Amino acid sequence: MITMKVKNFIYLPFCLFIGTSVAGALPEIPEPFKYGVGGIENGKIYIGLGSLGNNWYMIDTNQSEKKWTKIAQWPTVPREQATATIIDGKIYVFGGIGKDTSGVITLQKDVYSYDIAKDKWEKLMTRPPVSLAGHVSFIHNGHAVSTGGVNENIFNGYFSDVELSKGNSALTEKVNRDYFSKPADDYFLNNHIISYDPSKNQWKNLGTTPFPGTAGSSVIFAEQQIYILGGERKPGLRSVRSWTGELSHDRIKWSELPPVASPEGVSGAYASVIDGNIFLAGGAYFPGAAEKYSNGEYWSHKGLDKAYSKEIYQLIKNDWKKVGSLPEGLAYGVSLPWQGGMLILGGEKKDGKAVSDVIYLKKNDKQIKIVK
């Protein structure tokens, strides 16, 4: 076993330990990983897309020797900001953004499944009824449920205009000004809730959320309860709002939780259940953007540097409490439940570079243990 010096930090009401090796820790990802997708089934973890391009990896955590192995490559346009769910032995990938054959970034509307037993990808004869990129997805009763994400026409239109304006700085400035200088409502982010039934290859309308759509939110689904946390209200402006919904017979009863990560909010944060408790960690934001927006400066992140949060929050008695910190600020990786804790796979750090780290958060009594 590798042993490293352990640093100790105190954050009432918990102790936080940051170490580098305990029994059960997982090896680093073979490549730096961000903006991708992941899932876990029967102790096997699958990750792909994002900075991995067409590569996908699997690690079997049931084995004594835990190592990442390549599986079948993604067969089509590489993409970011997609989602993946695992249902009945298949991984279903929805949406995302990638470059089309002309080299322009566009929203992807195809749906693919990966047969775990056959190590094979298949394009499905279906398309989501609403645009899905920067959305969230979770599994309920064998269906993949999705909400949130960018507006296809507005998003695709912006990147098409950026491509057309190349070489003309004045036109590029106008394209950016026209795109960013709008209030949040005018981005028409998706607040429809849709459900995909893979056994019938059909979509179902579950209505809309009672709050505006977001992009880059974090989602948890546990014991018929949905948690949608933070996210982006518009490009460069985060949300502090968090919501919970009780799902029963395809109906959702929503209620708002106290704000999290105030005053700026975060997007691309990591979230999961740890020992029956709701946790949110990391995420990215632009310090000062919320104040500028409230003063009517709709291009609220212009001239601001992106920051990466280290904070770990726990939902305690219907309120968010800071209970610790990650080793460094991280966002835009994958978080998964594992062995009663939360795995943080990859992410982006302050310099914008992707990382290969695998971090494990575990709560023991009144202690949060972080293993990197």
Curated annotation (Swiss-Prot):
Q: Which reaction does it catalyse?
A: N-acetyl-alpha-neuraminate = N-acetyl-beta-neuraminate
Instruction: Cite the InterPro entries for this sequence.
Output: Kelch-typ_b-propeller (IPR015915), NANM (IPR056734), NanM_proteobact (IPR019936)
- Principal place where this protein is found? periplasm
Q: What class of enzyme is it?
A: isomerase
| Signal peptide positions on this chain | 1-25
- Residues annotated as catalytic: E232
Enzyme Commission designation: 5.1.3.24
Q: Please state where this protein is localized.
A: Periplasm
A Gene Ontology MF term for this entry? racemase and epimerase activity, acting on carbohydrates and derivatives
List GO terms (cellular component aspect).
periplasmic space
Keywords tagged on the record = Carbohydrate metabolism, Isomerase, Kelch repeat, Periplasm, Repeat, Signal
Kelch repeat spans: 44-88, 90-141, 143-177, 178-223, 226-269, 291-340, 342-371
> Which family, according to the similarity comment?
Belongs to the NanM family.
Q: Can you state the subunit structure given in the record?
A: Homodimer.
Tell me the function of this protein.
Converts alpha-N-acetylneuranimic acid (Neu5Ac) to the beta-anomer, accelerating the equilibrium between the alpha- and beta-anomers. Probably facilitates sialidase-negative bacteria to compete successfully for limited amounts of extracellular Neu5Ac, which is likely taken up in the beta-anomer. In addition, the rapid removal of sialic acid from solution might be advantageous to the bacterium to damp down host responses.
What is the name of the protein in this document? N-acetylneuraminate epimerase 1
Q: Which organism is it from?
A: Escherichia coli O6:H1 (strain CFT073 / ATCC 700928 / UPEC)
Tell me the gene name: nanM1
